[in-house]
């Protein structure tokens, strides 16, 4: 098949997306496909005729993930055409020539449904879920509201906008999150009123809406779901702090155990909850649900990831490997579900 792996963009998760794209590109090449790795924002300014037959080093632009989120203004300055269009030069043209686009994007303008909606209008096939469910899952406030409506256990919380902020914490400690952020960018644990107020001000740098929820002290887990079926539970134990941007993507920053060493009842309960969340949010193809478990063994579903990371340290590939699915086969399975 002719496959475009679409990565990059201008979200705070740009670097992660590029490394996901590189890994997926290599895996699909191994499977014998004609594959292009394309930055959705920077595009490709060369000759596009017979683009899939050209001998181009598509991964030359991809580097390692830094400990901090990327300088997006510097990325925007790299755009030679100066166009305000989100899609870089020839992106839509190249995607229309493909059999399917593998969505290796993360964060805003990737996981939020906007690109999916554009692709639907252009008749372009893509991996992952549809525009509506993508947009819902990108908004943590709406996701939590749906979890509550479907009886899915989730931490208590409130959400508010920059126009009407809640500057007095409802309860402490609490977690302050950018409503539409990802990779734990814009996430702070506040233990005091002063920390809370500082966190609210800082988090508004990442968007106009914030979610504040009760802090669940305990163990962190994740459960991938492929085509409605849960994978093994994985436990994530950061060596320092919580599972933030640095701990997620710097090798050696966390200890991950899959299958998680927890009672079978807890494993089955979390897997069932992940599948229920998948159905409640109307997800398609694949996703990953994040959980916390308190000292009493009660688990809470935090959020859904519609385009989980596929880097060397990412959780979904580790979960798939635990049931004998190689990274290459996982990528192929995701493609097969989309076509």
For every predicted segment, state its role.
Residues 1-132, 136-138, 142, 149, ...:
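ATP-binding N-terminal substructure of ATP-dependent carboxylate-amine bond-forming enzymes
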Residues 214, 223-225, 278-310, 320:
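Conserved metal-phosphate-binding beta-hairpin within the catalytic cores
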Residues 107, 184, 239, 305-319:
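Glycine-rich phosphate/pyrophosphate-binding beta-alpha loops
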Residues 191-272, 293-300:
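Phosphate-binding site of ATP-dependent enzymes
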Residues 3-7, 11, 15, 19, ...:
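Active-site nucleotide/adenylate-binding loops and adjacent lid/helix of ATP-dependent enzymes
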Residues 35, 125-126, 154, 174, ...:
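Hydrophobic beta-strand scaffold residues
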Residues 330-339:
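Cysteine/selenocysteine-centered motifs that mediate thiol-based redox chemistry or coordinate metal-sulfur cofactors
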